[in-house]
Each structure stands twice: as structure tokens, then as C-alpha cells.
Amino acid sequence: MNNIIKMLNEEQMKQDVPEFGAGDTVVVKVRVVEGGKERLQAFEGVVIAKRNRGVHSAFTVRKISNGEGVERAFQIHSPIISSIEVKRRGRVRRAKLYYLRERSGKSARIREKLATK
């Protein structure tokens, strides 16, 4: 019984998910259906949390839109996610960046992780 559940979970997992973590700036392309038409909607922001639970893995992205903070949670292996693109790697010391909710402007900046040779 346990092996069957494990096999079903592995079938549903996407293989083309890039490596990313808290502090990284990502662009998530989401499939949106409007009036019978399907289009891709891009949501770009900073990953403030990531939860690794196999098929149930999820992450939260935060961006500032018109001066207002917007957060959106995504399931990594969801069929509505078309692609995830990592724009910038951030250097942070925390796994969850919930403190960014209270900050704005320069205090909400995240240092960039430089590529190692």
C-alpha cells in the first residue's frame, strides 16, 4: 500500500523544477483561463518561504504592486504552473523571510549571491 502511494506521488511530480530558495527572485508563469481562452500570466517577486514535502511542496512569492505588498502561494508541482524561472539569487541568513512584510524600501533589499568559481 505504501509503495503504491509513493509511486503515484512520484508520477505527479514535475521533473523540470529549477533549484531555488528563500531570497531568490523568481518569475512564475501561471496558466489563467479567461472566457474560454487560456493565457500565461507572469508573477515576479522574491521567494519568502519554501516548503519541501514531495508532491505537496509549496513556496510563497512576494512582490510590491502599486505600493501595496502582494503575496501568492504556489504548489510547485501544480498543473497550473507553466514554468518557474530564477532571475536573481539572493543571499539571506533565514529560511523564512516573513520579516519583509513589515519592511519597505531600502530595508527590504536582499543582497545578491555572487556565483562561485
UniProtKB/Swiss-Prot annotation:
Protein name: Large ribosomal subunit protein bL19
Entry GO MF terms: structural constituent of ribosome
Superkingdom in the source lineage: Bacteria
The keyword Ribosomal protein is annotated on this UniProt entry: yes
PROSITE patterns: RIBOSOMAL_L19
InterPro entries: Ribosomal_bL19, Ribosomal_bL19_CS, Ribosomal_bL19_sf, Translation_prot_SH3-like_sf
Keywords: Ribonucleoprotein, Ribosomal protein
One GO BP: translation
Pfam families: Ribosomal_L19 (PF01245)
Any one cellular-component term (Gene Ontology): cytosolic large ribosomal subunit
Encoding gene per record: rplS
Entry similarity comment: Belongs to the bacterial ribosomal protein bL19 family.
